């Protein structure tokens, strides 16, 4: 079989890689609208616990979520200097996700992705993990960004942003 046929057998996926604490995660680049430095976050009283606050991104108010909190990871008192906000679109709503670092954007082949390991017992966790990419010694957890937040949580985040924008 010629090499060109082998190459076309597996689709390449472009991923935005980010870190939360000691873990590496990836999301398909098509879900990412932009990556921004952490802007001044306005904390909103009585906002749902998963919402860190809102930011003004070039005139548009976006709800920002602490992804570490959403995943039940240890929260830091201060964000690292490398922290970024990944702006995504979920259920037709733009949201910001605070992550510790966005070191790279990579291309991988679908054949490098393995199903979610059985060791992950929680159905909630399995619900938003698409699989695991093995890149040498690195394991990158691939997220299904549409399932990280429920539709109800996305609606709540959109309401918070609209109240502030009004």
Protein language model regions, located:
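An acidic, low-aromatic, low-complexity terminal/linker signal
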Residues: 1-166
């Amino acid at each position: 079989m010629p090499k060109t046929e082998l190459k076309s057998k597996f689709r390449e996926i472009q991923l935005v890689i980010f870190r939360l604490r000691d873990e590496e995660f990836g999301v398909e680049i098509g879900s990412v609208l932009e990556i921004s430095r952490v802007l001044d976050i306005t904390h909103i009283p009585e906002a749902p616990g998963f919402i860190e606050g809102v930011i003004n991104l070039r005139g548009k108010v976006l709800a920002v979520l602490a992804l570490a909190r959403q995943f039940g990871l240890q929260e830091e008192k201060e964000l690292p200097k490398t922290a970024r906000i990944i702006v995504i679109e979920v259920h037709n709503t733009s949201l910001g996700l605070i992550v510790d670092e966005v070191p790279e954007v990579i291309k991988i082949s679908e054949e490098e992705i393995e199903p979610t390991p059985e060791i992950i017992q929680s159905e909630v966790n399995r619900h938003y993990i698409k699989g695991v990419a093995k890149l040498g010694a690195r394991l990158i957890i691939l997220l299904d960004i549409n399932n990280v937040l429920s539709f109800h949580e996305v609606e709540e985040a959109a309401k918070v942003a609209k109240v502030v924008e009004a």
